Amino acid sequence: MKQLLDFIPLILFFITYKLGGVREAAIVLVVATILQIVILKWKYGMVEKQQKIMASAVVFFGLLTAYFNEIRYLQWKVTIINGLFAIVLLVAQFQFKTPLIKKLLGKELQLPEKAWNTLNFGWAIFFIICMLVNIYISHNMSEEAWVDFKSFGIIGMTVIATIISGVYIYRYLPKDGSNSKDGEK
């Protein structure tokens, strides 16, 4: 339910854009995002920090898009958010020696430190790729192509990155059913 709720604003944005246009789609996106946060708070008692940041960015850039009737503000949001995610992951790993992926998944998975660093770096590269592809599409293709990319392309890229991460993690999982604390083979 929670994951489905994350996609509702995007789906409504896509449909409204195809039926109405940029301004209408941006307004629907902002309203749906605010409702999503209200529902999450009501149903689960809290909203995760990452969701608050994303919702704030959607509301800010969505309102700019609606006010100016110009999609470039939402295009900037995708670029900025992906860039920030990459920077945060890289700074945490190289400056503070703490792979954030480990903080997110460390309770569920026991992996060697090298694996956490590789995963963290891989996701940082993924966000950089998303940022660069977004810049390319938003500057060199039609508005409709960008909306399609935003609605489906990034999701597809995320699924591929998740599968690659899963395959990478699999090699560190215990083979005999034991629960190895350090995740070493």
Swiss-Prot record:
<comment type="function">
    <text>Plays a role in cell envelope biogenesis, maintenance of cell envelope integrity and membrane homeostasis.</text>
</comment>
<feature type="transmembrane region" description="Helical">
    <location>
        <begin position="76"/>
        <end position="96"/>
    </location>
</feature>
<keyword id="KW-0472">Membrane</keyword>
<keyword id="KW-1133">Transmembrane helix</keyword>
<keyword id="KW-0997">Cell inner membrane</keyword>
<feature type="transmembrane region" description="Helical">
    <location>
        <begin position="118"/>
        <end position="138"/>
    </location>
</feature>
<feature type="transmembrane region" description="Helical">
    <location>
        <begin position="53"/>
        <end position="73"/>
    </location>
</feature>
<dbReference type="GO" id="GO:0005886">
    <property type="term" value="C:plasma membrane"/>
</dbReference>
<dbReference type="Pfam" id="PF04279">
    <property type="entry name" value="IspA"/>
</dbReference>
<feature type="transmembrane region" description="Helical">
    <location>
        <begin position="27"/>
        <end position="47"/>
    </location>
</feature>
<feature type="transmembrane region" description="Helical">
    <location>
        <begin position="149"/>
        <end position="169"/>
    </location>
</feature>
<protein>
    <recommendedName>
        <fullName>Inner membrane-spanning protein YciB</fullName>
    </recommendedName>
</protein>
<comment type="similarity">
    <text>Belongs to the YciB family.</text>
</comment>
<dbReference type="InterPro" id="IPR006008">
    <property type="entry name" value="YciB"/>
</dbReference>
<keyword id="KW-1003">Cell membrane</keyword>
<keyword id="KW-0812">Transmembrane</keyword>
